[in-house]
């Protein structure tokens, strides 16, 4: 449970009345992004208020009338998702910077410059975000807003969502370490063992992650892995 001194007010006007709960601002953000959260950790008090600052609680009858339930967790979910979370200016700056970094990283990994078929460096994406004056919603997930952001950036920065399908062959002496590393990396769609003990797989990854994959193969297969780009999808 978040402490009262770290909690902020989430407020919803419904049925002509205002209802408030005291919440952890970061868990409230996670809930708005569509993530599951523990409501015992989210709420500073398992109460629904008419005025949290005055400690004025909403009555059970009123909650049932307006929300159709007196379950505090269910009501808190509705207040957070449908209402407004009153975060501080410092919290907003912190959340905005974190979200900006997530968006830059996502765009760098999942898009390419169609002129070069290579990903844009994060610094270039960051400059384009500033130049385009893109609005970033701290309460939306990256996935929910990145397509609109990329659309806004395209007049400034050529971008294209693209994936690659890559065939990889690992020599027998490196399979133990390489296989687990590639599965942890993600994107293995097919695999096959060869009679000589080597291992072949096909991976599908965002094109922006190709460099990371090559770096990984260099480490786990000592530069002895064979790779071939089968196709680009996008």
Curated annotation (Swiss-Prot):
One of its GO terms (biological process) is cytosolic ribosome assembly. Coiled coil: none annotated. It comes from the Archaea. Disulfide bonds: none annotated. InterPro entries: EFG_III/V, Ribosome_mat_SBDS_CS, Ribosome_mat_SBDS_N_sf, Sdo1/SBDS, Sdo1/SBDS-like, SDO1/SBDS_C, SDO1/SBDS_central, Sdo1/SBDS_central_sf. Belongs to the SDO1/SBDS family. This is Ribosome maturation protein SDO1 homolog.
